[in-house]
């Protein structure tokens, strides 16, 4: 067994789904396989390209997470893991399942939005995504 992890933007309430990237959810599967989840976090977190760069086709989604509170959240996470979280941190992983979640105190939290397909579109436009591959390589 092991803990399952997903990249999450706590500010915008968005996440990346590693399964859509043909990789597992465990830390070792993401950290030592294809680096694809890390590539997506980089694409979302860089400062917007509108000031130049030119190494990728411009897309307004690039840099969408710049300056936001972005973390990898695990299914064993508890509130004490991140006391300055804008929401009870222990609920963050549950909010990546596409459904609203009611915590133990009866408070309902709105589900996070999956932005994986939006970032895959950027990667396809820049030759970084092979739909037929068993695993993806970031570069």
Language-model-derived ranges and their functions:
Residues 20-33:
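Conserved, aromatic- and glycine-enriched, well-ordered alpha/beta core segments
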Residues 1-22:
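Short, extreme N-terminal segment that most often corresponds to the first beta-strand
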Residues 30-139:
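Low-complexity intrinsically disordered segments
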